[in-house]
């Protein structure tokens, strides 16, 4: 099947399929004489695996590790569990950071009069960083993380 059919069948966009090939997450597709990519059932199965792992929030590096474990029939389930538990810990850190941001914003919004006056603690906090928020930005996750 061509890339469009593989995309439709797997639920992974053609653009992402090309990207996953480029970064080595999936094997390069076979090519026709006219250089079109062709995919088989195993390729689509792998793409579905990748899509599901992405849906669960695993990083590309974690997916590489999971794919290697999936392909290794002699793997120990404890290795797979370790990847999952590490991911759960990351998710819990993100949740805590988002909850802290929510508390801070609720506090600031509660002190903003929301009227015609220009004074606003939300703007003041963004401009000056004056609120005591115990967080730092983690560029890997795009959210603040607790210090």
Curated annotation (Swiss-Prot):
The answer, when asked if Phosphoprotein is one of the entry's keywords, is: no
GO MF, one term, reads: DNA binding
Q: Where does the record place it?
A: Cytoplasm
Extract one GO BP annotation from the record. Answer: positive regulation of DNA-templated transcription
Which ranges does the record mark as transmembrane?
A: none
Main localization category: cytoplasm
Q: Which InterPro entries match?
A: CueR, DNA-bd_dom_put_sf, MerR-type_HTH_dom, MerR_fam, Tscrpt_reg_MerR_DNA-bd
Keyword Transcription regulation assigned to the entry: answer is yes
- Domain HTH merR-type intervals: 1-69
Q: Which UniProt keywords apply?
A: Copper, Cytoplasm, DNA-binding, Plasmid, Transcription, Transcription regulation
**According to its record, what are the GO cellular component terms?**
cytoplasm
Q: Which domain of life is it from?
A: Bacteria
Q: Which residues bind DNA?
A: 3-22
**Free-text comment on this protein's domains from its UniProt entry:** It contains a N-terminal DNA binding region and a C-terminal metal binding region.
Q: What does this protein do?
A: Transcriptional regulator involved in acid tolerance. Binds copper.
Q: How is this protein named in the record?
A: Heavy metal-dependent transcription regulator 2
Organism expressing this protein natively: Rhizobium meliloti (strain 1021) (Ensifer meliloti)
């Amino acid at each position: 099947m061509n890339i469009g059919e593989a995309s439709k069948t797997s639920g992974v966009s053609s653009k992402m399929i090309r990207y996953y090939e480029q970064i080595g997450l999936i094997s390069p597709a076979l090519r026709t004489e006219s250089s079109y990519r062709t995919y088989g059932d195993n390729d689509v199965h792998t793409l579905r695996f990748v899509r599901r792992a992405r849906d669960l929030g695993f990083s590309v590096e974690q997916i590489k590790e999971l794919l290697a474990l999936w392909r290794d029939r002699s793997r120990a389930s404890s290795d797979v569990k370790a990847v999952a538990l590490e991911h759960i810990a990351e998710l819990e850190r993100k949740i805590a950071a988002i909850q802290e941001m929510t508390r801070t914003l609720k506090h600031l919004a509660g002190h903003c009069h929301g009227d015609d006056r220009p004074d606003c603690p939300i703007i003041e906090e963004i401009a000056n960083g004056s609120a005591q928020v115990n967080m730092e930005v983690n560029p890997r996750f795009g959210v603040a993380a607790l210090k």
